[in-house]
Amino acid sequence: GYIPGAEPKGELKESGPSAIADVTDAQAVASVVKEYHIDTIYNLAALLSVVAESKPKLAWKIGIDGLWNVLEVAREQGCAVFTPSSIGSFGASTPHTKTPQDTIQRPRTMYGVTKVTTELLSDYYFNKYGVDTRAVRFPGIISNVTPPGGGTTDYAVDIYYSAVKGEKFVCPIKQGTLMDMMYMPDALNAAITLMEAESER
């Protein structure tokens, strides 16, 4: 169902028209696409890694059933679709250095499983129906605007929130652990740039 707090706020709300649609409701998605004459869908609906692990059924419903709905609407309405994947789609058996684009993906988390499925389902819709589907495997994304919400790299932001509040923070990551991260504005710019590129590229 509808997620309270999903409405755009502040600068985003003022930047143009907006509508709320539950990605698990195909008719609601189709209605918004038709009403606003949308030609590109940025499907960012997913539970973050930590939350997905504690609510696997909901993670699948939002991440995969929701994607199915978006892809069907895109097929029917002629839309392009961006759905981010993640380095969480890899697993312990994936090469850790110079990881190839096409490689073994055996994630051990529900979040990772949904991301592998996202890649495969998007490829299927491209090959079977010609839907222009595109994706990027993002690392953990951090933001100075959005508070932590259940992602693997949330500690990197949470530590600053704790410092501002004068609270003690115990880092859950073992010393010496390396984690890839990306700044939210850079991730958004990457998604937009990818979708604006000619499909032949």
Can you name each region flagged by the protein language model?
Residues 108, 139-153, 173-185:
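Glycine-rich "substrate-gating" loop/helix at the edge of Rossmann-like oxidoreductase active sites
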Residues 156-170, 178-201:
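Alpha-helical substrate-binding/gating segment
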Residues 60-67, 74, 114-115:
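Short alpha-helix in the Rossmann-fold core of NAD(P)-dependent oxidoreductases
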Residues 92-95, 106-134, 139, 163-165:
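Active-site Tyr-X1-5-Lys
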Residues 23-62:
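NAD(P)H-binding glycine-rich loop region in Rossmannoid oxidoreductase-like domains
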Residues 13-25:
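Rossmann-fold cofactor-recognition segment
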Residues 37, 43, 68-110:
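Conserved Rossmann-fold NAD(P)-dependent oxidoreductase catalytic core, especially the SDR/UDP-sugar
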Residues 25, 40, 66-69, 80, ...:
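Conserved cofactor-binding/catalytic machinery of classical short-chain dehydrogenase/reductase
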